């Protein structure tokens, strides 16, 4: 079963666990354990000495998703085969017209810089570690989750593999905020977002979520709004609890201004695990996703965790190409050019499955808010044929004309016949005389 998120729990100082929205039959699966955790406290100011609940996140590695890998995945991944990369990168690969690289903050488990596809993509000086008490630059990744997320955005081309990031000239700001062992919570995520804003991020990717219903005036909500107000495209995964089909909001994806991303499969349909809800903005490939792992090589994984960076990569390309567009316009462009299965949006894939090439090629005008397609015009109702019970005046005139012609023909024939008889009779009389 792909990814089980942790239920609501009481956490220290109102902070709660955020689950990494990845996992599946192949690759890394995420599960939550919370033995003995207490119900959520209602007191606005929990005691400072409250014990840290014994919750944790368990990552169950499977198949080839171990690291470092000894071999690379040679083939072009299916999520890239559906694209014409030359057309996608016709204008930019992640650098703006001045040559500056678009800055994408990856708030996750860290981003490993040893993988050669990422070593040249990371701004180490801008990174930060919110997990290790000693601090750090955000390039420690003991889980591999953040390294995979970053690779989908900005992995550089490398000989021996067909995998490459969607914006291979973009720059990654590595922010380690979750270690997969319960240390990632709303408070640290709020701090990580603030750090991304301070370090000049133009796009922020968040591949984790909680179903605790948060308000906009929560610490996390305030930090998200600060990022949105700073004209940053904030992309977040919707979560992987969609197997039941139950619709519910997850955060930070459901905050206003955030582009919430669900997962689609190879048929451009919602992946069975992708969380549905009225907050879904778009969907993107999230099944059998190839990306970088710590050390060397690539692996395959599943989850909305890997749909979000696919969209973040497109956002980075658009930011590079259209520096005059606002973050909201970037989001609208992604939504307007998505491939739709219905005329408008739905709660499963939002405005549709992201089409990167279309987003970068149908960009001649500044985008507006998405609206439903008009659809085909209504068909004209069939009308019964008129039934004539009597003849029309024209038909009557035509009938009279036919009669006149017939009578005339008969008269001519009679006259001609009479003339012939008279002529023959006269001829006989002459012979008898």
Kindly give the residue locations of the regions a language model identified.
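Active-site core segment of subtilase-fold serine proteases
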Residues: 51-169, 198
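Active-site-adjacent substrate-recognition loops and nearby beta-strands
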Residues: 237-258, 262-279, 291-303, 343-349
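Subtilisin-like peptidase catalytic core
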Residues: 132-214, 265, 341-343
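Substrate-binding/access-modulating region of protease and related hydrolase catalytic domains
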Residues: 177-251, 297-302
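C-terminal membrane-anchoring or membrane-association module
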Residues: 407-433
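C-terminal subdomain of the subtilisin-like protease fold in secreted/lumenal serine endopeptidases
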Residues: 272, 322-417
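C-terminal segment of classical bacterial N-terminal signal peptides
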Residues: 20-32
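Hydrolase catalytic cores
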Residues: 152, 286-354
């Amino acid at each position: 079963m792909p990814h089980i998120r942790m239920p609501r729990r009481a956490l220290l100082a109102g902070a709660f666990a955020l689950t990494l929205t990845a996992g599946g039959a192949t690759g890394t699966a995420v599960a939550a354990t919370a033995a003995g955790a207490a119900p959520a406290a209602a007191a606005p100011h929990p005691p400072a000495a409250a014990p840290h609940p014994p919750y944790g996140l368990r990552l169950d590695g499977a198949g080839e998703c171990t690291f470092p890998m000894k071999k690379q995945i040679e083939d072009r991944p299916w999520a890239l085969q559906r694209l014409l990369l030359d057309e996608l990168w016709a204008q930019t690969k992640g650098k703006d017209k001045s040559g500056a690289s678009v800055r994408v903050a990856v708030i996750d488990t860290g981003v490993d810089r040893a993988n050669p596809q990422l070593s040249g993509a990371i701004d180490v000086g801008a990174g930060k570690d919110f997990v290790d008490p000693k601090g750090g630059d955000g390039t420690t990744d003991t889980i591999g989750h953040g390294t995979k997320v970053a690779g989908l955005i900005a992995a550089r081309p490398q000989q021996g593999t067909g995998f490459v990031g969607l914006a291979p000239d973009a720059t990654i700001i590595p922010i380690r905020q979750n270690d997969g062992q319960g240390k990632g919570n709303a408070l640290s995520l709020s701090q990580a977002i603030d750090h991304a804003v301070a370090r000049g991020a133009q796009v922020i990717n968040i591949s984790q979520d909680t179903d605790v219903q948060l308000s906009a005036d929560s610490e996390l909500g305030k930090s998200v709004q600060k990022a949105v107000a700073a004209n940053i495209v904030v992309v977040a995964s919707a979560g992987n609890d969609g197997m039941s089909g139950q619709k519910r909001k997850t955060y930070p994806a459901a905050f206003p201004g955030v582009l919430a991303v669900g997962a689609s499969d190879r048929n451009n349909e919602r992946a069975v695990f992708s969380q549905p809800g009225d907050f879904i903005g778009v969907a993107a490939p999230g099944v059998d996703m190839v990306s970088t792992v710590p050390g060397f090589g690539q692996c395959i994984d599943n989850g909305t965790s890997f749909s979000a960076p696919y969209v973040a990569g497109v956002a980075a390309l658009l930011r590079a190409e259209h520096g005059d567009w606002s973050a909201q316009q970037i989001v609208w462009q992604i939504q307007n050019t998505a491939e739709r299965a219905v005329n408008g949006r739905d709660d499963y894939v939002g405005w549709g499955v992201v089409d990167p090439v279309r987003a970068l090629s149908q960009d001649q005008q500044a985008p507006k808010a998405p609206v439903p397609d008009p659809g085909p015009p209504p068909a004209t109702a069939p009308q019964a044929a008129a039934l004539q019970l009597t003849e029309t005046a024209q038909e009557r005139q035509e009938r009279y004309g036919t009669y006149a012609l017939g009578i005339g023909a008969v008269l001519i024939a009679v006259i001609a016949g009479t003339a012939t008889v008279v002529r023959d009779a006269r001829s006989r009389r002459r012979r008898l005389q």
